């Protein structure tokens, strides 16, 4: 129930906390594959390294990563760097007062951000930051105008500027990754955030199929039983 309320609140507030830059931007299709556990593990590591400092994921516990093939030792080595236990919630390292002082607003919890925004929106958002000297952070975003969040991945992607007149992004300084490598990194990160929003989704689908098959089977048995009961009457 708590997750449902949070998701509804995020959806309702989205139009008030973000708006586009005045031009229509086509969202890129995110290559999501929830069955790819290696991608989910890479995404989990990237999330902890680059997102969990400011953003929390308070509906998720570290030990839930057993679902994506991570052992207890893997979780401790790759995901826990602050002395937390594997059964603890994934809380942001930065305190709320500090975050508000830095960004003017407390960074949102990312537990259900993929369900609120959509995978394609996140995939496009994380790849369309550009330098903008008119903003407080020095960064802006093609689909989230005047975003408070700085581009924390700029050293990976490189520096981009918005080309006047065309609305295209042009790279002015390369990062440590090629475009293909960065796109793959973001795809893994978004894939993980989709998993984060509903870790039990694969089990729910399997259970749903099993229940439907059971009901269809029961329907057939019920029909045969009905025919047997009414055989003498008909």
From Swiss-Prot:
The cofactor named in the record is: heme c
Keyword Cytoplasm tagged? yes
Q: Where in the cell is it found?
A: Cell membrane; Cytoplasm
The family database entries (Pfam families) matched by this protein are listed as: Cytochrom_C1
Which keywords, in A-to-Z order, does the entry hold? Cell membrane, Cytoplasm, Heme, Iron, Membrane, Metal-binding, Monooxygenase, Oxidoreductase, Signal, Transmembrane, Transmembrane helix
- Could you say which residues form the signal peptide? 1-20
Residues bound to heme c: 51, 54-55
Membrane topology value:
Single-pass membrane protein
Record PROSITE patterns? CYTC
Gene Ontology CC? cytoplasm; plasma membrane
Q: What molecular function does GO assign, one term?
A: monooxygenase activity
Query: Looking at the keywords, is Transmembrane present?
Result: yes
Enumerate the spans annotated as Cytochrome c domain: 38-193
Q: Record's InterPro entries?
A: Cyt_c-like_dom, Cyt_c-like_dom_sf, Cyt_c1
Which residues are listed as membrane-spanning?
A: 206-226
Cofactor-binding details, from the entry:
Binds 1 heme c group covalently per subunit.
What the record says about family reads: Belongs to the cytochrome c family.
What this chain does, per the record?
Part of the ammonia monooxygenase complex, which catalyzes the oxidation of ammonia to hydroxylamine, the first reaction in the process of ammonia oxidation to nitrite.
User: Subunit structure, briefly?
Assistant: The soluble ammonia monooxygenase is a nonamer composed of three alpha subunits (AmoA), three beta subunits (AmoB) and three gamma subunits (Cytochrome c1 PetC).
Designated name of the protein: Ammonia monooxygenase gamma subunit
Native organism: Nitrosomonas europaea (strain ATCC 19718 / CIP 103999 / KCTC 2705 / NBRC 14298)
């Amino acid at each position: 129930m708590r997750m449902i309320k949070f998701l509804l609140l995020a959806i309702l507030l989205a139009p008030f906390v973000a708006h586009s830059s005045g031009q229509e931007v086509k969202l890129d299709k995110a290559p999501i594959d929830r069955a790819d556990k290696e991608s989910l593990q890479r995404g989990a590591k990237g999330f902890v390294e680059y997102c969990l400092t400011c953003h929390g994921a308070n509906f998720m516990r570290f030990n839930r990563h057993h679902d994506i093939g991570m052992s207890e030792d893997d979780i401790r080595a790759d995901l826990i760097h602050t002395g937390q236990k594997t059964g603890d919630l994934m809380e942001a390292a930065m305190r709320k007062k500090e975050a508000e002082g830095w960004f003017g607003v407390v960074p949102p919890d990312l537990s259900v951000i993929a369900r609120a925004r959509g995978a394609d929106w996140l995939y496009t958002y994380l790849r369309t930051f550009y330098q903008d000297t008119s903003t407080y952070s020095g960064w802006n975003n093609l689909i989230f105008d005047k975003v408070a969040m700085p581009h924390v991945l700029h050293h990976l992607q490189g520096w981009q500027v918005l080309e006047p007149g065309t609305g295209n992004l042009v790279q002015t300084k390369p990062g440590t990754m090629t475009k293909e490598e960065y796109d793959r990194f973001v795809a893994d990160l978004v894939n993980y955030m989709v998993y984060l929003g509903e870790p039990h989704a694969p089990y729910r689908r399997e259970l749903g199929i099993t229940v439907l098959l059971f009901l269809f089977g029961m329907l057939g048995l019920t029909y045969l039983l009905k025919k047997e009961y009414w055989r003498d009457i008909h």
